[in-house]
């Protein structure tokens, strides 16, 4: 049996299928992998959380980076992989998407149950009162004033609602992701070459509870040896092939 057909059968039979996505899903929309380079090939250096808190200069650099990335997102959109996942959810074949991506493309494609373990670049959060703002409007304010804005509710520090290096994940978000993984009977990992803590434990948690694990990634991953099926192919093309068997 063709491997794509096998996964389609597993997906058809699953009652609690969950997908975990990483940067590889978004690179097929032309969005750079944030861990390495920007869209022009320049090396980027992320601002760590403790440095953000301590340095006004670092906060300015952080806002420049994130607002530049948000601008790049305006030239991108959901790709075939995002769209098919949204269709599978709408058809009742997929319970949720857990993602390490901060671009919000799953929601733009139509997915409604999305757990963003690293947050979203599309919102700004006050680190004091937790008030949220639209990132587009706040980036426009930042670029016009050439100054990092403060919270108009309490005067606190404002930061894009993403998880920076050294910043703790939101406990309720991690709890939701863990619960979904442990309850899954099929767990698909898409575009994640290097899962980072604590997200790297989710496929193992799913597998320990009896779930089949499927990996789709262009490069080899540390999970390949224990997965039930592995595809080193384009994510969009792989999901399209699986979807073809679902339509039969």
Question: Can you say where each PLM-predicted feature lies in the sequence?
Answer:
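Conserved catalytic core of sirtuin-type NAD+-dependent deacylases
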Residues: 1-248
């Amino acid at each position: 049996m063709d491997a794509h057909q096998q996964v389609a059968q597993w997906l058809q039979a699953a009652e609690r299928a969950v997908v975990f996505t990483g940067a590889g899903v978004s690179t097929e929309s032309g969005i750079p992998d944030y861990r390495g380079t920007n869209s022009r090939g320049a090396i980027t250096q992320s601002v760590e959380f403790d440095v953000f808190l301590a340095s006004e200069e670092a906060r300015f650099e952080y806002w420049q980076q994130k607002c530049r990335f948000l601008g790049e997102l305006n030239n991108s959109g959901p790709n075939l992989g995002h769209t098919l996942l949204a269709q599978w959810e709408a058809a009742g074949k997929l319970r949720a998407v857990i993602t390490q991506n901060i671009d919000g493309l799953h929601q733009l494609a139509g997915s409604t149950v999305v757990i963003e373990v690293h947050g979203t670049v599309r919102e700004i959060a006050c680190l004091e009162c937790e008030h949220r703002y639209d990132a587009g409007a706040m980036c426009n304010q930042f670029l016009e004033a050439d100054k990092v804005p403060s919270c108009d509710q309490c005067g606190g520090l404002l930061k894009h609602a993403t998880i920076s290096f050294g910043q703790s994940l939101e406990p309720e978000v991690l709890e939701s992701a863990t619960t979904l993984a442990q309850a899954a009977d099929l767990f698909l990992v898409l575009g994640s070459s290097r899962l980072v803590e604590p997200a790297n434990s989710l496929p193992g948690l799913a597998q320990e509870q009896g779930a089949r694990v499927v990996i789709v990634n262009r490069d080899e991953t540390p999970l390949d040896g224990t997965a039930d099926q592995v595809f080193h192919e384009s994510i969009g093309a792989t999901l399209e092939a699986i979807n073809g068997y679902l339509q039969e």
